[in-house]
């Protein structure tokens, strides 16, 4: 599998990790842990930011709401002050009537209104007051800080700085009445009003700081009229910033009158005044939601990590161990160890199915290997061959089994036919030997008779009652010749002694030629039964030569026919040799075909080895598929929250499924190749049978050619007979007879060479032929002498004729 075919996760891993499912599983768990932790951190940061913004908006909103409420309260009090001042009459008002009026009005006001005074600015005295202790008193600047706020001729309501009255912090509002020189003063309890702040957050702390940095209002009444400072004793800069019209939000330490700790604080201005309202909420309370979300998120992350750890220790570890065992089994099978033990499992999931598939594959391969071994050993009765192998591969093995059985049956039949042919040839050779023995005996008798005739006993005759027509023809011709010889004995008496001496030498040579011919006949018995007749004809030629007579010239003419016939016999012998070479070539081609069959079987074995490699690929893909299937289950459980992760894993599973499909295609192609190799092997075996048949036909053709050689030898025998009948022409052709004898000698040599392939007697025949050649030379000398004598005889005959004429 190339890098292109692997997933991104597989390509980025080092080779050491890719080779181990456990390592990849642990890396994946680590990646998931990192992703979960990163997601938790991101959610935490997002929550912190969101909660921080919400907290800021909430705290600032509460501060602004409280400031608006305070502004409404001040506006209401100013309106009340103006209303009360307007109810004080003009110049006709009596002092005694003012106090009751003020008391009636105080009774209608809120409880935070402490007292109402009417002050004469010209006399700095209290004209009337709801506080009896104040009525008719002269005001001092220390007792009435609001005096500084009264300005003659102003119609506006003024608000004094906070101060204490009887240890109670108050603030006063002044407004001029309709009576000139009189001013209405209404004092309000800051402690009473501070309690009116309604904080939505129970732990919220509301403080109002005036322009001097003094705490004017405090909902907890713990620091009224104290300086509002930070831990360093300084007024926070945020107060001045808020006084300029901005709402400021900070997380800062405690301020005056607050418990230690950090607070979420909002500073906001109070409209129409130089006051600043501050709202403090303990940070833990303000960010309680953030803390809760963080805790819940941390708990979720911990649960997820623990779950992943448990999955890794249980499912992942068990799966890794099982896959390691399967990988070992697959490696053993790929190495040819089909007896390796596949671990048992009671799992019914994909891993259990994979283990079962390995078992089935092991059984399949074991059966296929056993059947292949049985076929290789030609053990066609093996029980394993009866087992059914599914698929094209099993069908190919079955077909090969059938064809091999048929081929071996054909080979056995061909072997039996060849054995029968050999037996027939041996019987034919035996019959030929028996015939040859009879002919040899008859030839010996003829030789004795001819030798006697050659010695001068012209009364000898040959027995014409023989079972061989050529021998019968020879006997008849000899008897006729001897009659002619007796008739002409008187004419050739003058040269009878010389002819007798020459005939004796020729007879001796002829005997030697006959002996050599006998050896040649014995050497070529495996070639043809009729080869023996050739030896007989050559013996006859020797005998006929001893019977030289007046017909020598006719013998020379017939010698041409003998040479031609013997040449034809030599040609047929050469043709037999060529056919023998063709038979050898056919056997070589048969051997080449067998080599090709061996190569096909070797290719079949290599294809079986390639099936082990594909099994390794299927093992790797199974490991990855199992791991990604586990991840898919984990992601599926979280699909309601993280559907994208499940989609990624699903894509990985799909990619691996495609890879499995490609590997399956590769296996199918490989099996097709194996089937093709098996088909080629069967074809080669068929071709081997054809070659054997062709070899048999070639051998039969060689035997037929050898039969033709026998026929040609018979023709040569006929020519020799013609030589016997035409001895009167021998005188004119003596030199040609010598030449023909040399050619016959050469032909005998070639016949001996061919006979060496059949029998060890070829060397003896060659030696005999050489001896015959030597004897032929001696005969040539004698014939030369005879020619001289005959020339003299012819001359004498011609002279006699002349005299007679």
UniProtKB/Swiss-Prot annotation:
Modification after translation, per record: Methylated by CheR.
TM ranges: 25-45, 296-316
A single GO BP: chemotaxis
Keyword Repeat found: yes
Consequence of gene disruption: Mutants completely lose the chemotactic response towards leucine, isoleucine, valine, methionine and cysteine, but they still respond to arginine.
Membrane topology: Multi-pass membrane protein
PROSITE patterns: CHEMOTAXIS_TRANSDUC_2, HAMP
Subunit comment: Interacts with CheA, CheY, CheW1 and CheW2.
Residues covered by region (Disordered): 513-532, 752-779
Location of the Methyl-accepting transducer domain: 509-745
Residues the record lists as Glutamate methyl ester (Glu) modifications: 554, 736, 763
GO cellular component, one term: plasma membrane
Biased composition (Low complexity): 754-773
Protein name per UniProt: Transducer protein BasT
Family assignment from sequence similarity: Belongs to the methyl-accepting chemotaxis (MCP) protein family.
The entry's keywords: Cell membrane, Chemotaxis, Membrane, Methylation, Repeat, Transducer, Transmembrane, Transmembrane helix
Subcellular locations according to the entry: Cell membrane
Purpose: Mediates chemotaxis towards five attractant amino acids (leucine, isoleucine, valine, methionine and cysteine). Probably transduces the signal from the substrate-binding protein BasB to the histidine kinase CheA.
Biased composition (Polar residues): 516-526
SMART domains in the cross-refs: HAMP, MA
The HAMP domain, residue ranges: 317-370, 437-490
GO molecular-function term, one example from the UniProt record: transmembrane signaling receptor activity
Gene3D superfamilies attached to this UniProt entry: 6.10.340.10, Methyl-accepting chemotaxis protein (1.10.287.950), PAS domain (3.30.450.20)
């Amino acid at each position: 599998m190339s890098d292109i075919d692997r997933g991104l996760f597989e390509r980025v891993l080092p080779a050491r990790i890719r080779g181990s499912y456990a390592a990849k599983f642990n890396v994946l768990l680590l990646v998931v842990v990192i992703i979960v932790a990163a997601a938790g951190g991101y959610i935490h940061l997002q929550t912190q930011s969101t909660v921080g913004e919400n907290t800021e908006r909430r705290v600032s909103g509460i501060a602004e709401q409280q400031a608006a409420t305070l502004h409404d309260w001040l506006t209401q009090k100013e309106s009340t002050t103006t209303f009360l001042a307007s109810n004080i009459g003009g110049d006709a008002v009596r002092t005694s009537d003012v106090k009751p009026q003020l008391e009636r009005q105080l009774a209608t006001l809120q409880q935070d209104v402490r007292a109402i005074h009417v002050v004469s600015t010209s006399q700095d005295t209290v004209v009337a007051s709801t506080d009896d202790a104040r009525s008719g008193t002269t005001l001092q600047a220390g007792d009435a800080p609001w005096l500084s706020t009264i300005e003659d001729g102003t119609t506006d309501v003024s608000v004094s700085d906070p101060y204490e009255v009887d240890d109670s912090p108050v603030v006063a509002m002044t407004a001029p009445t309709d009576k000139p020189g009189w001013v209405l003063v209404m004092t309000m309890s800051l402690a009473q009003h501070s309690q009116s702040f309604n904080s939505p957050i129970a732990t919220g702390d509301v403080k109002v700081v005036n322009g001097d940095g003094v705490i004017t209002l405090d909902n907890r009444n713990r620091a009224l009229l104290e300086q509002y400072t930070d831990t360093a004793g300084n007024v926070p800069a945020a107060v001045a910033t808020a006084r300029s019209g901005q709402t400021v939000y900070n997380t800062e330490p405690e301020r005056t009158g607050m418990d230690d700790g950090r607070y979420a604080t909002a500073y906001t201005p109070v409209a129409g005044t130089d006051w600043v309202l501050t709202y403090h909420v303990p940070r833990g309370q303000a960010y309680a939601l953030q803390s809760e979300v963080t805790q819940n998120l941390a708990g979720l992350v911990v649960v997820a990590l623990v779950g992943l750890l448990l999955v890794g220790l249980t499912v992942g570890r068990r799966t890794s161990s099982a896959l390691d065992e399967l990988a070992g089994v697959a490696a053993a099978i790929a190495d040819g160890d089909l007896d390796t033990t596949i671990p048992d499992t009671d799992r019914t999931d994909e891993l259990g199915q994979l283990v079962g598939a390995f078992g089935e594959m092991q059984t399949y391969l074991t059966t296929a290997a056993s059947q292949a071994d049985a076929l290789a050993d030609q053990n066609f009765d093996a029980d394993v061959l009866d087992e059914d192998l599914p698929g094209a591969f099993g069908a190919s093995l079955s077909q090969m089994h059938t064809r091999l059985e048929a081929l071996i049956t054909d080979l056995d039949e061909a072997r039996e036919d060849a054995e029968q042919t050999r037996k027939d040839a041996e019987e034919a050779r035996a019959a030929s030997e028996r015939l040859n023995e009879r002919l040899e005996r008859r030839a010996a008798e003829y030789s004795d008779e001819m030798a006697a005739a050659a010695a001068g006993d012209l009364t000898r005759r040959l027995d014409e009652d023989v079972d061989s027509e050529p021998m019968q023809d020879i006997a008849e011709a000899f008897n006729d010749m001897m009659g002619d010889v007796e008739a002409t004995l008187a004419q050739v008496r003058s040269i009878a002694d010389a002819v007798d001496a020459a005939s004796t030498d020729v007879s001796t040579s002829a005997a030697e030629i006959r002996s050599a011919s006998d050896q040649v006949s014995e050497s070529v018995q495996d070639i043809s039964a009729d080869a023996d007749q050739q030896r007989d004809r050559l013996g006859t030629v020797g005998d006929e030569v001893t019977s030289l007579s007046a017909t020598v010239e006719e013998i020379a003419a017939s010698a041409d026919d003998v040479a031609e016939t013997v040449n034809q016999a030599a040609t047929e012998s050469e043709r037999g040799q060529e056919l023998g070479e063709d038979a050898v070539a056919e056997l070589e081609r048969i051997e080449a075909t067998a080599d090709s069959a061996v190569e096909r079987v070797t290719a079949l074995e290599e294809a079986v080895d390639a099936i082990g490699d594909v099994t390794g690929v299927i093992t790797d893909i199974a490991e990855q598929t199992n791991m990604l299937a586990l991840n898919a289950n984990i992601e599926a459980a979280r699909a309601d929250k993280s559907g994208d992760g499940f989609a990624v894993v699903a894509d990985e599973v799909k990619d691996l499924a495609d890879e499995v499909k490609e590997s399956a295609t590769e296996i199918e192609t490989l099996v097709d190749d194996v089937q093709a190799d098996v088909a080629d092997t069967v074809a080669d075996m068929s071709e081997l049978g054809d070659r054997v048949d062709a070899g048999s036909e070639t051998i039969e053709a060689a035997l037929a050619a050898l039969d033709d050689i026998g026929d040609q030898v018979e023709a040569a025998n006929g020519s020799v007979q013609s030589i016997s009948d035409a001895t009167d022409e021998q005188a004119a052709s003596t030199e040609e007879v010598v030449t023909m004898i040399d050619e016959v000698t050469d032909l005998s040599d070639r016949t001996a060479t061919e006979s060496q392939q059949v029998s060890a007697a070829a060397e003896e025949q060659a030696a005999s032929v050489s001896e015959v050649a030597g004897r032929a030379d001696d005969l040539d000398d004698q014939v030369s002498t005879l020619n001289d004598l005959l020339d003299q005889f012819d001359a004498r005959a011609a002279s006699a004729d002349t005299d007679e004429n």
